[in-house]
Amino acid sequence: MSSSRSGEHRRNYAQGRNYESSRSRGDQRDRDYREYRRNYRDERSSRRYEDSQRRDYSPARRRDRYERHRESVREESPRRPVEHERNWQPELKHGRERFRERDYEGRRDRKERRDGVSPFSPEGEGLERKREHEKLQAPSPKEEEERPVDQGDKMDGVKEDKDGSLEVGKSHDAMTRTKSAEEEIVEQEDEATAEMKRIMGFSGFDTTTGKKHGDVGQVYKQKKTKYRQYMNRPGGFNRPLDNE
């Protein structure tokens, strides 16, 4: 049986039989699909599929689409300051302080809008004028650092009268009254504790450590060391023994 199979194989090889592989079939299938897509026309637009794909993915169309996207994003997002604009110092204010003040004003305006106060209403105009007045009246940080410190600021609770005499302030009087009240409370607690100990008989008890006395009620014991003799230890018999 094996000889018949080998003979058939030799005959087929001699005749030049074409064995089609699966790879060739797959390539033919891909070519048929590409041909079908090339000749396919859309029913709604009546245009070829390949033409629409070529136009959608062309470099010019991609560039236009990217430019439109950039313009839309630029319009939506607010402009952020550049590095040299952040460090720009208008007048005496540093760039960071200026932007910090701008952020504070933005949060304040949002809070007013949330509370219902419109900047165009009479109340809003009054608040705006009040803020401008406070800005003009408030000293700058450099002026506060350069301003000398008065001696009156250092004296806590002391003020000068018209005639030149010094009067103790209310804060100093309040602190003195508080301290005296605390001392009185402590003294009252000590007196109450001593009275309770005296009534219950605890006031006569005290420690007897290190005291010499002859009272029978008080005990003071002094322990004396005694040595024992060990026969199985070297030098045990040389130790002096107690006289018993």
Curated annotation (Swiss-Prot):
Biased composition (Basic and acidic residues): 1-11, 20-116, 126-182
Protein name listed in UniProt: U4/U6.U5 tri-snRNP-associated protein 3-like protein C162.01c
GO molecular function annotations of the record: RNA binding
Record-stated family: Belongs to the SNUT3 family.
Sequence positions bearing Phosphoserine: S121, S140
Gene Ontology biological-process annotations: mRNA cis splicing, via spliceosome
InterPro entries: SNRNP27
Keywords of this entry: mRNA processing, mRNA splicing, Nucleus, Phosphoprotein
Compartments where located: Nucleus
Domain of life: Eukaryota
Disordered: annotated span: 1-192, 223-244
GO cellular component: nucleus; U4/U6 x U5 tri-snRNP complex
Compositionally biased intervals (Acidic residues): 183-192
Assembly notes: Part of a tri-snRNP complex.
Protein's job: May play a role in mRNA splicing.
